[in-house]
């Protein structure tokens, strides 16, 4: 496939094509691989995203800025960028890695994206790298809620209830299934003030609590979108759009 097409999607045409090829080369393919470029790109990426958040969200404190940045530069987010760039066909992998589906592996895709950022930095300097990174992240930031990104379902449910001066949810393990080494936990999440009671399962108590909290928050948003009101028990399958952070956390 033509590297020129990838360069157009990336928003940078390389003066040194060898840097682009190296950025796309996994260590399974040969000695001149992309791990050092990945290291460099990770640092440039973190700085650029930090600057973008600092300028965009003047009211966020240090802790919230760090939380949002961590979620924007994590593996899943970088793998999403790789998908938008349609990067998989351009990766240079060893035969074994190729056969095992490495071109679809999120870790390999994320590493290659960071390596590309590092390669752009070496090829044309910081301003060019910043432009490329901003081009990838501006549309992402347009759909980000900094108040919820990176917060898990239990935290969001707690904040929702506290904002309405309601008691915190009650989590109860109602059943366990399976052998000791592969147990499934079934947890109930109850919000008495809203007459909500839902259950969910998970491979650990924590995972089950997170899944139950997500269902409870969906139900609470139906029963009490802004203010508390009485009603029948909310259905555990309430269909609502929750912050993306919750959906990712409990997959």
Swiss-Prot record:
Main function: Digests double-stranded RNA. Involved in the processing of primary rRNA transcript to yield the immediate precursors to the large and small rRNAs (23S and 16S). Processes some mRNAs, and tRNAs when they are encoded in the rRNA operon. Processes pre-crRNA and tracrRNA of type II CRISPR loci if present in the organism.
Residues covered by the DRBM domain: 152-222
Record gene name: rnc
NCBIfam families in UniProt: RNaseIII
EC number: 3.1.26.3
GO MF annotation list: double-stranded RNA binding; metal ion binding; ribonuclease III activity; rRNA binding
One cellular-component annotation, GO: cytoplasm
Keyword RNA-binding included in the entry's annotation: yes
Keywords attached to this entry: Cytoplasm, Endonuclease, Hydrolase, Magnesium, Metal-binding, mRNA processing, Nuclease, RNA-binding, rRNA processing, rRNA-binding, tRNA processing
Cofactor: Mg(2+)
Subunit structure: Homodimer.
Pfam families in UniProt: dsrm (PF00035), Ribonucleas_3_3 (PF14622)
Protein name: Ribonuclease 3
């Amino acid at each position: 496939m033509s590297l020129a097409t990838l360069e157009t999607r990336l928003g940078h045409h390389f003066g040194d094509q060898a840097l682009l090829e190296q950025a796309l080369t996994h260590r399974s393919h040969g000695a001149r691989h992309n791990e050092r470029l990945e290291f460099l790109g990770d640092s440039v990426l973190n700085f650029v995203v930090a600057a973008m958040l600092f300028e965009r969200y003047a009211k966020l404190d240090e802790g919230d800025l760090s939380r949002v940045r961590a979620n924007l530069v994590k593996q899943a987010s970088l793998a999403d960028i790789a998908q938008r760039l349609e990067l998989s066909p351009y990766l240079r992998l060893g035969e074994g890695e190729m056969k095992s589906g490495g071109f679809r592996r999120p870790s390999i895709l994320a590493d290659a994206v960071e390596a590309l950022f590092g390669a752009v930095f070496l090829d044309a300097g910081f301003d060019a790298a910043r432009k490329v990174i901003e081009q990838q992240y501006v549309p992402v930031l347009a759909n980000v809620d900094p108040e919820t990104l990176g917060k898990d379902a239990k935290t969001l449910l707690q904040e929702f209830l506290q904002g309405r001066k309601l008691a915190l949810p009650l989590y109860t393990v109602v059943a366990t299934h399976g052998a000791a080494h592969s147990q499934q936990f079934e947890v109930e999440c109850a919000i008495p003030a809203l007459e909500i009671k839902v259950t969910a399962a998970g491979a650990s108590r924590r995972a089950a609590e997170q899944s139950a909290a997500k269902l409870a928050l969906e139900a609470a948003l139906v029963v009490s979108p802004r203010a508390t009101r009485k009603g029948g028990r909310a259905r555990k399958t309430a269909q609502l759009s929750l912050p993306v952070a919750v959906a990712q956390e409990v997959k």
